[in-house]
Amino acid sequence: MYQKLPNATLLKSGHLSRQFRKIGIFTFHDACDFVWKLPYGRTSDKSNWLLVLSERTGTCSTKHALLKALANELSLNINLVLGIYPMKESNTPGVGTVLEKYGLEYIPEAHCYLEYKGKRVDLTRHGIRCDEEITEFFIEKNIDPDDIGEKKQGIHKNYIKKQYGIDKFKKIWAIREQCIGAL
């Protein structure tokens, strides 16, 4: 999966490189493997991607933002992408029961991943088998690691408001939160 990305030896002087080196990780690919294998879960501050290392968990946003920041430190030309996709059981196992309860086929969900030379690399959930990969996106936008908090949420909420209207927004967002809780 992460072999599609360029590799580099971590720096002795870089802040993030030092954090990874302290735990025995010395290359970008090793950092990708480590982060990919961490369990899926929100950190105590969902916009602070540095917490992935200390809390040993992360979401698509925090895991990929951390790796993008490390790539920046190593001068690797890798993009952090925010995409809005149709979240459904076949591409996000665990959400089907919630969607079925409300008679929904899908809910537009924000997803972050890395991109290199036109290839998507998703290191969110290791070992999870899906009937289909997430390949359909309504929108895709390059973002910076520090955009995974309010800016990402704003883009996501605005998309849902446009899709369903202001009147239904709160209900759809609440269903979305139930879906995330089911993961």
Regions found by a protein language model. Give the residues of each.
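Short Gly/charged-rich anion-binding patches and loops
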Residues: 30, 65-66, 109
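His-Asp-centered catalytic microenvironments across diverse enzyme cores
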Residues: 2-4, 8, 18-23, 40, ...
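Secondary-structure boundary elements
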Residues: 1-58
